[in-house]
Amino acid sequence: MLPDYLAKAVPNPMGKRAPWYANTAPSYAGIFLWIAFYQQLAGKTITHGGLAVCFAGLVVAGLLCYALYYLVPAMLGLKTGFPLYVVGSSTFGVKGGYVMPGLLMGLLQIGWFAVATFFATDFILKGLGVHSEPRTAPFAAAGVVWGCLMAWVGAKGIQYVSKVALLLNAIPLLMLVIVFFQTAGGIGQYHVPAAQDNPFVAFTMTLAIVIGFFATAGAAGTDFGMNARNASDVRWGGLVGIALAVLVAGGLPLLSVAGAHGAHSTLAGYDYDNVIQAIGGPVASVMFFLFAIASIPATCFCAFIAGNSFSTMIPGVPRVASTLAGAAIGIALAVTGVAANLISFFTIVGASFGPICGAMAADYLLSGKRWAGPRAGINFAGYIAWAAGFVVGILPFLPLSAEVKTYVQPAALYSFFTGFVVYALLAKAGLQPKVVDMPK
């Protein structure tokens, strides 16, 4: 007997699907236009290599995100009409699917909610001219108010956020363009700090940051694919919403940070908000407020997805209660400053979902480019592949020498290939359980 999350699953009919430019492309582009993507991008990239190297990294990273992390999940969604937690039951099993990708997606969404709450709070306080520092009373008060409000909207009124999400996504794009023109004059004067010059590190860190940021969204390509009409929608939605969006949403901030440092040699820090502060005046304050407002969809959707993941995989848990409980954890991570370290969080996300995407890709290809169907019990081929890939993905956190750590990035990419290869080998060795029938 199948669990409820499979027994009650109904494929999305073709009549409810839409073209790529109405759903997939703008939704994915909105993910990359979120401030969390590029806030700390420059500090680990253009400090080690020139803009040409970093732009090459953006191009390659965007194509890798599209081809490796998005395409197979999206095609599975297109062909089945089912969301990620259903199609994942092939790679991880009917019982195994509870945890991966089901509950794991919910847990990581709490982390994303914390990130969204942290930066919205930080930018609101900076816009008000108030000292912004985690673990202080103003930061805690603003973080709790923002987090609780967004969690409630995510639990009870997500449909209203969906209606304005595309409009709000246009705000950061406009801000990126304005900041670029404000700083463009200094781009030619930017020079990589001589003591840190290492193009290899610049290129690999660009890949690591982009792929780590995208990993969960790539697996969620299943949910976008189930809303696509055909393979062309899947391809164009990914190429425009992912590959092109990475270049625009990553490239403009890199140019802006480089330009700001070229024009102001005394500028401290390579975070994107350092550039906004350097612009100064009412313009900077307005920008901080607008970036915070543009974080509304991300905060609400993270809360909604987390609650939905928990309530779907554990039906006895009410969705609103699980949403608010997850939000409470996220708020704590935000106001204490834990959520401020984006690069480390991206690495964890890449380590968690890189091998999931890799194992799913192997399963898809071994099954003749189709969904095999749910597999009985736990698919240990999937779990072992994930564990091996996760270990590879967290290598940057292990006590390795600085020289070795130079070569462990992009760990998220290596974790994908580890998951792919290990799953393929174990599947060939007969470790995949038998397929069980879905209800008609």
Sequence positions of predicted segments:
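Membrane-interface "cap" regions at the ends of multi-pass membrane proteins
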Residues: 1-55, 65-66, 198-207, 226-233, ...
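Juxtamembrane transmembrane-helix boundary signature
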Residues: 58-92, 101-111, 115, 428-431, ...
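Extracellular loop-to-transmembrane helix junctions
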Residues: 42-74, 96-101, 242-247, 414, ...
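Hydrophobic, membrane-embedded alpha-helices of multi-pass small-molecule transporters
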Residues: 18-35, 180-186, 194-258, 281-300, ...
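Membrane-interface loop-to-helix entry segments
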Residues: 141-182, 197, 238-242, 346-358, ...
